[in-house]
């Protein structure tokens, strides 16, 4: 066991920095550096075996790289590197990011011709000669290294101008990526380029834009990046690299984003295939389009062929209606089999319905690996939230960690939508200060735009997780304080549902699996439904309420499918409370014959198998409520399914007082009203009965108010001069209401519930004979 504990986990090794030339970016004393220089501490220079003024190649993100000259700076911390603002922009990095540094051993070619484009918005207001004022002073350093495609900024007394290097030609008239500028370099200025075009190039998706799936990204990078970059690893060890990877998971979890990020970071050619683009009404043309896509990818290798929604392009042939779909599946199989082992082409497929794909595709040699890109957990969601808010102006009161705790079940696209809605709400708040007909917006208004916590609160209330949009999802606003009495039941529910969500580490410590379900049983009107809603609210879980008949369907197999889909959606939105009201309608004791109850029996079997944990439940809690527990199938009530059987009895005296206080907490009451006296007069009344008494009393007060006002109108009195005739609820209203009150639960029914509750208890006295234990199983 000790050896197993000390084993190193290599599953995410590809994500770790493994070389001494990895440095942390900082901006210490950047004012002492020129555009083409980087600052390093002398000890770091020694470690890397570098001298001052050596040329180094620095790798940033998304395949960005630049050549710099080194400068020794004591102020830069060891293992850090100071890079000027333009350099950080070109490398797509920020302060505290890491970069890799390599010595440039060969000479950098001298640039004979240099073409550049000024960025339009930086030269619009410049009146002087741009070349003389900005470009010539900038290029006045001998052997200054530049990189094609990079943006450089020059500041003078007239302002700041930025330009993009578009082309560099060496002495042999060849285009080069890196080169050094000298006094002999010919410089050509072309037309201007817009800021939008520049940002479009620099805003490519990279690994840093993908969050919430660290383990999956490690697997994908192993399977895609290694064969594309270092195929010799596979040939040396004597195995073939993978040909295809299938990414599956709910919509909006980042499958397409991952494919684009890998293509950009590896520099691979990305060929995107969408089903409708391949399909053609002409016979044989669809297969031809598919062949052309693979041929194009092989010509541009290393390449990634990304087939989005592959289930539409390659469905199961035995279930496919059209001949075209069958031929396309066959063609895809042939093309994947015909791919050369080391052709530097990888096929990525994405789907949210993996079981709809033809099984012939899902074998080794075709789609070798299947990786689930699921709904992110709490850590993943926070990572994604930080990605979506990294460029957002936010006020100091925004606490992303606290916001994240309320976003159970949100996918990456849901979180993007949430951030967008929060920003939009901030703009709405500023609209009264904005003249929409004016060409420009006041600079003060623009400067005051900051997304605050209230904007996020609004966005949370108006954004639902996409996995639950098909289901009628409720966000109950019922708290423990809204439910009178039942203190022992509330504590039991906290331990069963709330604790596994809030304190999962405690369950791991004691090696215990949390309970899967709770059954509320008892007389009608005692607060079973209300308790389920309070549980969901208090543990900030999603809440899905299901009525039995909603799941029934006239088609064979459809009812069971509805239950499967329901649990799948609940798992996607975990932690989630599934509340089956009147569960006896779909979980009656099985009859054992093939009569009309066959559909109900099949539904019960499906419900049992879902609750048995055949599929991992991921904090999905099932709460059933019934007032006919004797009719439920006994298999449903065993441990491992509905673990906790909670009897919700008629309220006792203290509980009745609490219920009356909760019901009347927003009602103005006369000081003469004694709720305890009212509770004593309503023995054996359920919570619903007490609520009805209070409602009827309030109706009487409202009736009295309206009748008085109508009477005064007839007399011609002014309404403004009238005093409120009924300022609060009086004792006589309650007395009048009590005269028509009735109990909804008879003595006979109460006895039946209590007999059932006794039958489900264990006689603890047989186990512990040393102590006196009362009938409730408590020590006296």
Swiss-Prot record:
ATP binds at residues 251-257, 352, 388. Pfam families: AAA, AAA_lid_3. GO terms for molecular function: ATP binding; ATP hydrolysis activity; polyubiquitin modification-dependent protein binding. It is found in: Endoplasmic reticulum. Gene3D superfamilies: 1.10.8.60, 2.40.40.20, 3.10.330.10, 6.10.20.150, P-loop containing nucleotide triphosphate hydrolases. CDD domains: RecA-like_CDC48_r1-like (cd19519), RecA-like_CDC48_r2-like (cd19528). Keywords: ATP-binding, Cell cycle, Endoplasmic reticulum, Nucleotide-binding, Protein transport, Repeat, Transport. Its main location: endoplasmic reticulum. One of its GO terms (biological process) is autophagosome maturation. It comes from the Eukaryota. Involved in spindle disassembly, degradation of ubiquitinated proteins and protein export from the endoplasmic reticulum to the cytoplasm. Acts as a chaperone that collects ubiquitinated substrates. Has a role in the endoplasmic reticulum-associated degradation (ERAD) pathway. Component of the ribosome quality control complex (RQC), a ribosome-associated complex that mediates ubiquitination and extraction of incompletely synthesized nascent chains for proteasomal degradation. CDC48 may provide the mechanical force that dislodges the polyubiquitinated nascent peptides from the exit channel. Component of the ribosome quality control complex (RQC), composed of the E3 ubiquitin ligase LTN1, RQC1 and RQC2, as well as CDC48 and its ubiquitin-binding cofactors. RQC forms a stable complex with 60S ribosomal subunits. Belongs to the AAA ATPase family. This is Cell division control protein 48.
